[in-house]
Amino acid sequence: MENKNVIQKMREKTPLIHCITNYVTINDCANILLSFGASPAMCEAYDEVYDFVSISSALYINLGTLTKEQETAAVLASISAKNHNVPVVIDPVGCPAIKRKVEVINRIAEVGRIDIIKGNIGEIKFLAGMDSETRGVDSLDNGENALDACTQLAKKYNCIVAATGQKDFVSDGKRGSVIKNGTEMLTKVTGAGCMLGALCAATCANFEDKLVSTTAAILSMNIAGEKAYEKAQLPGSFRIALIDNIYMISDEEIWERGNVEWK
């Protein structure tokens, strides 16, 4: 396995992360990227994204509040990412409820590129063609067969797939990881999943083994959440403490404290 200094390598480069994301959590995504050591840019005008992706280190596309303008921008940005060798992270927020989002993902896969798909377990199982239980943008799934869903979807799109829930699962189609860190308080803060997608973009920007970089991003969020909850047990203060702990997170801490099973 590649050297696991994922966070160190990311912070040495201060990668520029181009985000086309939803209006609910855009500020949180920008702030957590800054705290993590990356440089966020929330550029989504369709006549600007092609050029901006060309100077970016990674592209993060979040489909949470997808407008037609964002759809056009996301497709154009993915084409630029393919042409300029920029990794792309997709967060298929709410795809079981709004089927148009699946069409957008398939279009991006067809004309652009996808390196990582990060969703909750319900979204990932839905995209993999498996039965899943969701409510709006939330997963009600218990996680059964989640790693199998990740593996199937990773093979379909030839990318890394991460499914988050009580346990988190990551697969590249052959290898996998199961992460057992975290706190339930992460489910009480709007946008924790969106912020995680942004972290996945940051860690993959300058790290070749994207299974490891994605696992590191999830560990960073989960362990920062655990530490935040030690000091802040209410949602508002927890959200602030989460971003503070992301600022302080390190490779040594995530791999020492992390409860990861490699498959």
UniProtKB/Swiss-Prot annotation:
- Catalyses which reaction(s): 5-(2-hydroxyethyl)-4-methylthiazole + ATP = 4-methyl-5-(2-phosphooxyethyl)-thiazole + ADP + H(+)
GO biological-process terms attached to the record: thiamine biosynthetic process; thiamine diphosphate biosynthetic process
Role, per record? Catalyzes the phosphorylation of the hydroxyl group of 4-methyl-5-beta-hydroxyethylthiazole (THZ).
By its UniProt entry, which Pfam families does this protein fall under?
Answer: HK
Q: Name one GO molecular function term.
A: magnesium ion binding
Query: Which positions bind ATP?
Result: K118, T164
Q: Keyword Glycoprotein: yes or no?
A: no
| Keywords in alphabetical order | ATP-binding, Kinase, Magnesium, Metal-binding, Nucleotide-binding, Thiamine biosynthesis, Transferase
Q: In which pathway does it act?
A: Cofactor biosynthesis; thiamine diphosphate biosynthesis; 4-methyl-5-(2-phosphoethyl)-thiazole from 5-(2-hydroxyethyl)-4-methylthiazole: step 1/1
Which InterPro entries does the UniProt entry name for this protein? Answer: Hyethyz_kinase, Ribokinase-like
Kindly give the HAMAP family that the UniProt entry links to this protein: Thz_kinase
Q: What cofactors does the UniProt entry give for this protein?
A: Mg(2+)
Q: What is its EC number?
A: 2.7.1.50
Which superkingdom, per the lineage? Bacteria
Q: What class of enzyme is it?
A: transferase
Organism per entry: Clostridium botulinum (strain Okra / Type B1)
Q: Which family does it belong to?
A: Belongs to the Thz kinase family.
The record's gene field reads thiM1
Is the keyword Magnesium assigned to this protein? yes
Residues that bind substrate, according to the entry? M42, G191
What is the name of the protein in this document? Hydroxyethylthiazole kinase 1
